[in-house]
Amino acid sequence: MIVSEFSKAQIALACWRSAKTETHLVMLSVCQVFMNRTKAGWYDGDLYENCIRWLAEFPGEFPDLRDPQFQQLLTNLETVTSGMVQDKTDGALWFIPTNQIGKSLSSQFSVTTTIGGLSFIK
């Protein structure tokens, strides 16, 4: 294994854990949030560092490698990380399950979009 493969694996794991009950499209949208954080300079503008810090804060389980949604995430991840696709989150820096958005949160931040069961905010 080479360093870039390990890095991509950690990025994929962070995206999967963030939206494991969602489709791969939601997982890829989460990847876009990590990309937006990177562009904003979080953790010295390092995508890998953004993802592993998130994984450390939110430890959890691991995907079933036979899961078709996880396989689609792996297949399409590089199109997001290389900047080949448009940001469907409109610059969001955070994501949250839509059913957890309260009035205090919605008054402090703006929801940029909702994809699947997640709302994307900035």
Task: Indicate where each model-derived feature is located.
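Bacterial extracytoplasmic/cell-wall-associated proteins, especially those involved in peptidoglycan
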Residues: 2-122
